Amino acid sequence: MGSLAKIVAVAAVLAALVAGGSCGPPKVPPGPNITTNYNGKWLPAKATWYGQPNGAGPDDNGGACGIKNVNLPPYNGFTACGNPPIFKDGKGCGSCYEIRCNKPECSGQPVTVFITDMNYEPIAPYHFDLSGKAFGAMAKPGLNDKLRHYGIFDLEFRRVRCKYQGGQKIVFHVEKGSNPNYLAMLVKFVADDGDIVLMELKEKSSDWKPMKLSWGAIWRMDTPKALVPPFSIRLTSESGKKVIAQDVIPVNWKPDTVYNSNVQF
């Protein structure tokens, strides 16, 4: 076979592979969105892990929810990237799940993880890409590293209510770049459902106005007219519960600043 014929033959083979979708494992469509149906039923999923073996996942201890320092309390590195029906375009940020595995190295005891990041690997209807610490925590004592050597395996999961120790209240972080005409806030440490489906803002002497979900757990308000502080925030959880953080953002608010509320679900 001449060189030109060889090139044509190779090109034909490559085209057939691409057309037939033969590159890589088959894609699995995502399952239905996980809701606040706390019925205790365990569901099947795939588990992987990333980052440092005993780390919180991302090297910057952050993630697609916008939450930072997930290696520190109250998350303590027990975090996970959820695939689309778990992450839900950011509306799953902060939700909590129990996970357990049944390998010989597994303890069989459930481990609770917080959703702080996303993954779009189409390997299963439900997929948890766990921090190394959370993955290893499913093991029997002393077998953490051996369990992590699997890299990927089947597990069971169920959604649970989020619980924070020590009377932790909801916290708001006014994001960098915020100004009187653009206000962006990260909300974190939400108990019970853990996630928020609606965030509303009330200026001084005004009515409630809905904010827009910007990305992850960050909500924003854009307005041509300067916002007048102090700002109250009303949160609605996935199950419809509401709390109001009255005047939580003060008159002299600043961007890139944390404001603690005195409310919790």
UniProtKB/Swiss-Prot annotation:
Keywords: Allergen, Cell wall, Cell wall biogenesis/degradation, Disulfide bond, Glycoprotein, Secreted, Signal
Protein's name in the database: Expansin-B1
GO cellular component: extracellular region
Region listing for Subdominant T cell epitope, in residue ranges: 150-169, 213-232
Disulfides per UniProt: 65-93, 96-162, 101-106
Renumbered residue ranges of the record's region Immunodominant T cell epitope: 123-142, 177-196, 240-259
Tissue specificity of this protein: Expressed in pollen (at protein level).
SUPFAM superfamilies: Barwin-like endoglucanases, PHL pollen allergen
Domain Expansin-like CBD: 181-261
Residue ranges occupied by any Expansin-like EG45 domain in the UniProt entry: 62-167
SMART domains for the chain: DPBB_1
Signal peptide range in chain numbering: 1-23
Protein's cellular compartments: Secreted, Cell wall
Domain of life: Eukaryota
Record PTM: Glycosylated.
GO-annotated biological processes: plant-type cell wall loosening; sexual reproduction
Biotechnology: This protein has potential use in diagnosis and specific immunotherapy (SIT) of grass pollen allergy for patients living in a subtropical climate. The diagnostic sensitivity and specificity is 92.4% and 93.1%, respectively, for the detection of Bahia grass pollen (BaGP) allergy in patients that have sensitivity level of 0.23 kU/l of IgE for this protein. The immunodominant T cell epitopes may be suitable for safe SIT for individuals with severe allergic symptoms to BaGP.
Similarity section: Belongs to the expansin family. Expansin B subfamily.
Protein role: May cause loosening of the cell walls.
InterPro entries: Expan_Lol_pI, Expansin/allergen_DPBB_dom, Expansin_CBD, Expansin_CBD_sf, LolPI, RlpA-like_DPBB, RlpA-like_sf
Positions of glycan attachment: 33
